[in-house]
């Protein structure tokens, strides 16, 4: 009698052939052949026509053993068990929810295979192992039905009305896939209207991923929550988290203070946590007028000792603007989690005019965006960062390769307000020098001016807003590079009396002394230097070719302070001298500069990966700039900044 399969969709079904027994006297079912034709051309060849069947079977048997897999088998078995359940066949236990007397006959083996809870119940020697009817206290009727339906069908329907019952049941019975589905459902459905409730559910059932998402959602949309009043329903812990976060967007500190006061006054017991919440408001970033008109007029801000001290802190901070970089704390920091590569100044390739542009690079949009420009154009200047304040020191406002137009002025940029102020000037005008920030001080090393090359070193103290001289170098240097590591400053290479150097010097501010270290393997000047981990990298620059011309130095190396030893690394892709350099996410970015081999300013930005020892060209400046400088700053997100036009930067001529 021929074999028959009842099927309406052959493409779904795949049957393992080895179970088929046939002979020349037993014709194959046309239905089976049809299935094979649609599923496996190789089997079709093996089965062949009845006339050539034996030879084909022999050739198949002669080959290696084959394993066949049915993609539909598991779903067929699952459907079979579900039908048995619906028909009440072979069920060996009845489950009852804790809130009703409803009864649900099921198969122990199915429940145990899907749940560690039921596996332990039915195989661990518990009394329920022998019971025919089990009451599940803590599981509702709705939740139990959802769990049973999922185990037998692999499908789960959810809405906000059934979600909590389903979560309780899945958590109680340890049905992990259902928990995952509930997480996805919650995250995908978060809105301004329900985010507080979703957060409560996440906290109740320890849904960490959902809780993190709600935090992120509230941070991103807190300004909108303020306008709707939904923030008043937030629990203390989540509100405190929001107020302390650097990721909070589009809210002023005054907005946050007023909102917190509203939240506190909604219920009397909330006033007990007033001081804890106010510690997260950044009062030093408010204006004096805001503090006087809106903050000091609130009763508990005048009576609670903690709140009074917060106001005193803000007042003292604002009274000492020059000291602010060394007074930084969580309450004085910019409320942003965005750190960007920043460039400033430089001399333009064609017109030889000097830029005063301050830009940051947005890696998401691959665009340069403008921040407040400097008060005066600069190139060959020194830059350094203390407490996320950017200092721009000395340099030149006019294009002059001899340094005769060096300046002594110093400016400081505050990214919190996108503003510049002028601070104390250098004792000597300097250009082609190095500037480092070390232990809360600035050190301006060497350089040149109209009087010639400089061996002197000046130190700026933000606490007194003064520059003072410290120990000078043994010889004058300009075009050198420097970096800091381990509480000391290192200076490499440069030019002394028109001779390129390869020496490495170390300055210890505690002893006010210079010491010599192992020299570089290559002489170079107008190069750059930076620190990554415990390595001091020296990159690019140029040196003499013969007696009157210059060559790019493509070779690079790093210095180990522990070993007092230099090691070569991969060479640059293209020569760059007189550049900006910054370390961002443990990668070294070399920005702009001048190529002596090509005799032109360059716009290229090259990135070096210390782990892979590889160089890559990553992006370009909006224009070719030599004598440019670079660093990293924490700034407000790029979407809140102004896009920088490619060829229309604010430049100032000589």
Curated annotation (Swiss-Prot):
Pfam name, any one: BTB
Domain BACK: 195-296
Source species, domain of life: Eukaryota
Keywords: Cell cycle, Cell division, Kelch repeat, Mitosis, Repeat, Ubl conjugation pathway
CDD domains registered for this protein in UniProt: BACK_KLHL9_13 (cd18449), BTB_POZ_KLHL9_13 (cd18239)
Repeat region (Kelch), residues: 340-388, 389-440, 441-487, 489-534, 536-586, 587-635
Cited Gene3D superfamilies: 1.25.40.420, Kelch-type beta propeller (2.120.10.80), Potassium Channel Kv1.1, Chain A (3.30.710.10)
GO BP field: cell division; protein ubiquitination; regulation of cytokinesis
Occurrences of domain BTB (ranges): 91-160
GO molecular function: ubiquitin-protein transferase activity
GO cellular component terms, A-Z: Cul3-RING ubiquitin ligase complex
Pathway given in the UniProt record: Protein modification; protein ubiquitination
Function as written in the Swiss-Prot or TrEMBL entry: Substrate-specific adapter of a BCR (BTB-CUL3-RBX1) E3 ubiquitin-protein ligase complex required for mitotic progression and cytokinesis. The BCR(KLHL9-KLHL13) E3 ubiquitin ligase complex mediates the ubiquitination of AURKB and controls the dynamic behavior of AURKB on mitotic chromosomes and thereby coordinates faithful mitotic progression and completion of cytokinesis.
Subunit field text: Component of the BCR(KLHL9-KLHL13) E3 ubiquitin ligase complex, at least composed of CUL3, KLHL9, KLHL13 and RBX1. Interacts with AURKB.
Protein name (record): Kelch-like protein 13
Gene: Klhl13
